[in-house]
């Protein structure tokens, strides 16, 4: 019975993907070719935001995950993914999984989601990561953006404890909540429990991986976002956030990796949320740092483009004052 349910869930997921029409990546993709061995060679740099030693999804990793997480294996087999748990199937499955990551890094987000979900639990991580990136940068309206982010959270809810097996899955889940928390009203955020879930999930992730740059920057952005909504005093007394903690999280993130565009523009936003115009020069400095970085994948190209737009807004603001 459980196998039937798992297979049904997988089928429903694939049907949902088929109905979606996502916008294509708007920039040149020629610099994001990670075919063949290029993916493994570039993997440490491509995944530096996830922290040190995020595992490359080769056949050895596939078998390790299958052995360590029997429920994931059961779901994968039930989903008719072509992987039966036998070592002789692992290489073919790993190649398919690697290709999903290639699609993510190249900016073929819709195809990455489709092919990722077709691989079952193992492919959900890059599939949902592709969806988060697409939702944040390419969705034309806020309602659709929120729907896609909520779907990411729903996928991780269905995965249950399996989310704990992958730090990117954990990050994607809390990132989606944090982005929704920024844009939804305070009553809605409170009703959904995001004000406690976001810091709790970030604490759990950082306890497991203290040096993850993305998670550290997200925590800093969360602190700033709460201050922006409720003010410094209420933020500190009610939610335990502060400008000092915001600064500490970003400093730790930059110490781990200072060449991530998103880190610099998120810090620029945080400075504005917390200090207003008082740290305008510093915000502009970090936006310029983001813009100066050469993107090595599609997500970073979107981040640099976003930083350019923010920088233009700040420069126009300065010119008017």
Show the residue positions of the predicted features.
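N-terminal signal peptide c-region/cleavage motif recognized by signal peptidases
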Residues: 13-15
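Short coil/turn connectors between adjacent alpha-helices in alpha-solenoid helical repeat scaffolds
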Residues: 135-148, 181-194, 227-241, 274-282, ...
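Outer membrane beta-barrel transmembrane domains
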Residues: 258-260, 269-275, 279, 286-289, ...
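TPR/TPR-like (Sel1-like) alpha-helical repeat modules
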Residues: 120, 199, 238-243, 247-248, ...
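Extended amphipathic alpha-helical interaction segments
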Residues: 173, 187-262
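N-terminal alpha-helical interaction modules that lie
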Residues: 18-163, 168-170, 176-182, 195-203, ...
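Positively charged n-region of N-terminal signal peptides that target proteins for export
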Residues: 1-4
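Hydrophobic helical h-region of N-terminal Sec-dependent signal peptides
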Residues: 6-11
């Amino acid at each position: 019975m459980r196998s039937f349910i798992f297979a049904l869930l997988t089928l429903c997921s694939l049907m949902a993907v088929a109905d979606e029409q996502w916008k294509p990546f708007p920039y040149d993709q020629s610099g994001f070719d990670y075919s063949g061995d290029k993916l493994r060679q570039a993997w440490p740099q491509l995944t530096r935001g996830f922290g040190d030693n995020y595992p490359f999804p080769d056949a050895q990793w596939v078998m390790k995950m299958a052995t360590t997480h029997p429920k994931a294996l059961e779901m994968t087999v039930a989903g008719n993914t072509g992987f039966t748990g036998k070592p002789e199937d692992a290489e073919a499955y790993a190649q398919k999984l690697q290709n999903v990551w290639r699609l993510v890094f190249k900016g073929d987000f819709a195809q990455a989601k489709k092919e990722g979900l077709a691989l079952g639990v193992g492919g959900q991580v890059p599939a949902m990561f592709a969806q988060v990136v697409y939702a944040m940068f390419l969705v034309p309206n806020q309602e659709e953006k929120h729907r896609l982010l909520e779907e990411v959270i729903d996928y991780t809810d269905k995965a249950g404890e399996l989310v704990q097996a992958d730090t990117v899955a954990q990050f994607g889940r809390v990132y989606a909540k944090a982005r929704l928390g920024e844009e939804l009203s305070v009553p809605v955020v409170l009703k959904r429990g995001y004000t406690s879930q976001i810091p709790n999930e970030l604490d759990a992730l950082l306890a497991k991986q203290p040096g993850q740059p993305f998670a550290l920057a997200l925590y800093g952005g969360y602190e700033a976002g709460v201050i922006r909504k409720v003010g410094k005093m209420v933020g500190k007394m009610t939610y335990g956030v502060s400008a000092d903690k915001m600064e500490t999280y970003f400093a730790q993130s930059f110490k781990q990796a200072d060449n991530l565009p998103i880190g610099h523009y998120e810090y620029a936003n945080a400075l504005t949320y917390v200090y207003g115009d008082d740290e305008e020069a510093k915000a502009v400095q970090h936006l310029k740092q983001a813009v100066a970085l050469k993107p090595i994948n599609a997500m970073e190209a979107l981040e640099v483009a976003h930083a350019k737009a923010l920088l233009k807004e700040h420069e126009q603001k300065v010119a008017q004052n």
